[in-house]
Amino acid sequence: MAKIPYAILEKGSLLLASPDTDQGVFARSVILLCEHSLNGSFGLILNKTLGLEISDDIFTFDKVSNNNIRFCMGGPLQANQMMLLHSCSEISEQTLEICPSVYLGGDLSFLQEIAASESGPTINLCFGYSGWQAGQLEKEFLEGNWFLAPASYEYVFSDNPDNLWSRILKDLGGKYASLSTVPENLLLN
C-alpha cells in the first residue's frame, strides 16, 4: 500500500488516531477526511458504530430491504445531525465524491429509496461529525496525534469496523504494523 506524505492531508485521506490518543471518541478512531482547506477540516468517524435500529421516524414505509445500512457516530460535533456516506453515484447533483465509489450527501427521499431496495448501495448513516479549525488538524498531525492512509471503498464500508484501525495500520506495514498490536490499555502490556 502506498504511503501518504504529510503534503497530502486532503479530502479522501484517512486519519488514524495514534495509539496514545486516549481522548474518548477519538481513541483508535479512523476518520474519513471529507473536506480540508485553509478554513478548516471536517471528517466522519468510520469505526464507532451505534447500536441503533432502523427508526420509523426516518423511514415512512414498513419494510427496509437494504441490509447494507450501518449507523455510525460521525463525531462529537452536532450529534443530532445525520450525514450519508454511500456508494451510489447516480445522484451526483446531491453528492460529493470523497474517494472512488464513496460519496457524501443525499436527501431523505434518496435514503428512503435506497433503504427499500434489496440491491441498494452500502450506506453509513453518520450522526455528528469531527471538525477542526483552520490550522488545527495540521498542528495535531505534526504533534503525532494522527497517521495518514489513503481512503478506499473497502475501508469506508468495512465489514468489520471494530477492527478497522488495526487492519489499516497492518496494511500500511513497517512501524505502523507494529503499532497495530499495542493494547488499548497499556497497563495490560
Swiss-Prot record:
Cross-referenced InterPro entries: AlgH-like
Pfam families in alphabetical order: DUF179
Organism superkingdom: Bacteria
Matches recorded under SUPFAM superfamilies: VC0467-like
Any one of the GO CC terms: cytosol
UniProt xrefs under NCBIfam families: PRK00228.2-3 (NF001271)
UniProt family annotation: Belongs to the UPF0301 (AlgH) family.
Protein name per the record: UPF0301 protein CCA_00630
